Amino acid sequence: MILLENVKKIYKAKSGDVTAVDNANLKIEKGEIFGVIGYSGAGKSSLIRLFNQLEKPTSGQITIANRVISAITGSELRKARQEIGMIFQHFNLLWSRTVRENIEFPLEIAGVDKAKRRKRVDELIHLVGLEGRGDAYPSQLSGGQKQRVGIARALANNPQVLLCDEATSALDPETTDQILDLLLDINKRLGLTIVLITHEMHVIRKICNRVAVMEKGKIVETGPVLDVFRNPQQDITKRFVQQLTDSEDTNETIESLIEKYPDGKVVRLQFIGEAVERPVLQRLMQRSDIEVSILQGNIAQTNNGSYGSLVVHLNGEETAIQQAIEGIHQDQVELEVIAHG
């Protein structure tokens, strides 16, 4: 569906060239929700704006739906952009137009006749849950409602791809989840390919099938979300995963326990998929003559399944602890020894 091959974007500046995107290679399948995550300055906004040619690549090739979009211009590019919707962090609505008129705007530009425009706007207002707000102006809407207008407007021309540029960054957590649920519903109903960029791992976890991690203009890691949660390869990816799997006081809790109980081992168990539902600790205590203390636990739901992390203290004879660890491995649960006495 979407293919990026050796794509580079360089900005010219008085202080020297700035490479925002450095030889990016990506393949995004039709109908999937693909996330790009990175901290500020990683190059993710520059990357997503290359998809619809709001930014021109310095080199490389971008193909969307078998069309080399990086090689077209003029009317052909304008037509291609109608098949690529986009929503933004700060909504980019026309403040002098009502909700209906904002949604209708791209249809006017496309030359759709008035009757068809009205019908399409009615469909979109229903789709995004804005019934009764069609005659309201943006200033009368909440942040979540404004983004719903943005989504409806982006879908007006029945695009194949929806680009989301930090679409939830300006929203509170509850509204963020509502917008993410809406995007997930639209993806399932319409089979729409969604590409989103964010700095929040929660967004990736909640709706994405796969994720690419960017750092200093480079894509440093790519994979299914569940695999990235289970086995992050890069330090930056590990930091993002820890946003969800480790509470802020985990290290303090572990350090306090080590001081209080210098014997035994502190281990982190990682559960993936079906392993989350297994009674691992119950089995551990049944077959091992050791004491088990739970320090911290977390279970996250991703679009591909569950991921869990549990930090426990194992205390007893060394041989019994080793047998317990071997038993945990047999349950297909990953184990990391954090500290040992």
Curated annotation (Swiss-Prot):
Enzyme Commission no: 7.4.2.11
SMART domains the record matches: AAA, NIL
Subcellular location: Cell membrane
Pfam families cross-referenced by the UniProt entry: ABC_tran, NIL
Record note on quaternary structure: The complex is composed of two ATP-binding proteins (MetN), two transmembrane proteins (MetI) and a solute-binding protein (MetQ).
Higher taxonomy: Bacteria, Bacillati, Bacillota, Bacilli, Bacillales
Protein name: Methionine import ATP-binding protein MetN 3
Catalysed reactions, as listed in the record: L-methionine(out) + ATP + H2O = L-methionine(in) + ADP + phosphate + H(+); D-methionine(out) + ATP + H2O = D-methionine(in) + ADP + phosphate + H(+)
Domain ABC transporter as annotated: residue spans: 2-241
Main EC class the enzyme belongs to: translocase
PANTHER family linked to this entry: AMINO ACID IMPORT ATP-BINDING PROTEIN, METHIONINE IMPORT ATP-BINDING PROTEIN METN 2
Keywords: Amino-acid transport, ATP-binding, Cell membrane, Membrane, Nucleotide-binding, Translocase, Transport
GO CC terms in record: plasma membrane
InterPro entries: AAA+_ATPase, ABC_transporter-like_ATP-bd, ABC_transporter-like_CS, ACT-like_dom_sf, MetN_ABC, MetN_ABC_transporter-like, NIL_domain, P-loop_NTPase
Topology with respect to the bilayer: Peripheral membrane protein
Binding site for ATP: 38-45
Main location class: membrane
Physiological role: Part of the ABC transporter complex MetNIQ involved in methionine import. Responsible for energy coupling to the transport system.
GO molecular function: ABC-type D-methionine transporter activity; ATP binding; ATP hydrolysis activity
SUPFAM superfamilies xrefs: ACT-like, P-loop containing nucleoside triphosphate hydrolases
Family assignment from sequence similarity: Belongs to the ABC transporter superfamily. Methionine importer (TC 3.A.1.24) family.
